[in-house]
């Protein structure tokens, strides 16, 4: 009898694990503009002081939804934007990851112009660390990577309890779901606030607009914008995503 109970418990555990590969995660994306701009060496002290005066210790918070299954993930604006009557922005920021083909589609705006990146997704060079923490009841491990174009250090916390190699902001490639990102030591924090593991229907728009770019063109666009902003002593992240 005892062996039967153990077997049933094991089956239930395996069944629960198998059901963890699709659902919807709500993330809160919090930007600390004062920290972000303080860390930019090419900005004038006057510009940094104006930011401190405008923002103080405040942050800018936005909710995003990630719907996922073993084949892919979609990341876009969540309820916060609709509550503040900005639902039109949902059609202007969208990331679709095809996890099977290792391809990505990203819709975004730079300088008031709508772009659409469609290409193979480059493999992120993650370094997994020997640190753990709990997020929304899931045990997570730490991984670190660098964005050399934007000058960012990205810390990710991922959990293999959700066995899908996806995450917010288009970051993928870890052995489990990314539940938190920390960009440049707190300048931006993207953290899961709700995890709903249920069968999902991906909310893909019928037509996704934007000037089409390949990955090399996208990288060149970001590099050019960063270089022009640095030369002009401007904050590039008023226009491009931090």
Feature annotation, model-predicted:
Residues 20-242:
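Extended soluble regions of mature proteins
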Residues 1-25, 240-242:
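Bacterial Sec-dependent N-terminal signal peptides
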């Amino acid at each position: 009898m005892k062996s039967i109970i153990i077997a049933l418990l094991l089956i239930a555990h395996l069944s629960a694990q198998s059901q963890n590969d699709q659902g919807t995660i709500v993330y809160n994306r919090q930007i600390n503009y004062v920290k972000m701009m303080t860390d930019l060496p090419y900005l004038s002290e006057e510009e940094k002081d104006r930011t401190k005066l405008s923002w103080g210790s405040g942050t800018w918070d936005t909710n995003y939804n990630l719907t996922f299954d073993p084949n892919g993930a979609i990341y876009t604006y969540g309820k916060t934007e609709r509550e503040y009557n900005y639902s039109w922005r949902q059609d202007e920021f969208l990331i679709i990851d095809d996890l099977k083909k290792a391809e990505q589609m990203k819709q975004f705006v730079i300088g008031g112009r709508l772009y659409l990146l469609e290409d193979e997704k480059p493999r992120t060079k993650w370094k997994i660390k020997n640190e753990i923490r709990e997020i929304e009841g899931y045990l997570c491990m730490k991984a670190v990577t660098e964005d050399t174009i934007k000058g960012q250090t990205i810390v990710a916390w991922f959990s293999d309890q959700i066995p899908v190699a996806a995450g917010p902001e288009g970051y993928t490639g870890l052995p489990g779901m990314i539940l938190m990102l920390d960009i440049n030591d707190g300048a931006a924090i993207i953290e899961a606030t709700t995890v709903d593991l249920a069968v999902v229907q991906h909310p893909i728009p019928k037509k996704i607009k934007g000037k089409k770019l390949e990955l090399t063109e996208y990288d060149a666009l970001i590099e050019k914008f960063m270089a022009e902003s640095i030369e002009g002593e401007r904050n590039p992240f008023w226009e491009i995503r931090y």
